[in-house]
Amino acid sequence: MQAKSSRLWEDTVNLMPHLRQKWQLSNQNERKKSMIIVESHRKKPETLRKAYPDALILDVTSHATGALRKLSPFYPHMGIPIPFTPGMTAASVEGIWQGLKTFEKADIDLDVMRNTTMKDLKRTVRRFGAPKGHRKGVHGTELLGYLTARWEIYLPTYKWVLENKCQMQIDLLRRESEKRTVVLLDYEINGDINDPRKPLSHAQLVKMYCEGNYPV
């Protein structure tokens, strides 16, 4: 299973330039009236109910209750393959993303990748100094820039989780979105993969996956 996962990583990365172009084209042609909408978790409940009176409003953040909490990148599913690192797995998507970061004063952090608490996963510039890039695998020598890391590390990792750990949640969202509007609440709402100014919304990735428009 570990070797199979590693091959899947390599196949996905080799297709990356084509996938980026494909995503950009399909994103431009995305249907205008989507039944899944992403909104800010910071909006007041009454504001959301007024804007979407007949919608099913769902929290998909790490603070959610029930099964939808598993859609959070912070959730410790365990056994998630670490990109470009055959035979090694981590607890969460966020743990991989943060753990592979390198800084002026710190290299990668395996403890962050093993963290199952959903807390203390963030690695900050204030503590570790200027960022140098994401290491391309635990034992890699190459450092990836922010957007490249987003495409080659974050997106494939989160997709693996959706396909291997969250199919029940995805099936539920697809069924409900066929009947009525579904609003997903996230703390971030940026769905532009190529915009480095804001963190990427995982709720937007869930929406894309449900609609068959996932970037990779």
What are these regions (language model features)?
Residues 1-31:
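N-terminal amphipathic/basic-hydrophobic helices that include classical n-h-c signal peptides
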Residues 19, 23, 29-216:
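Charged, low-complexity intrinsically disordered segments
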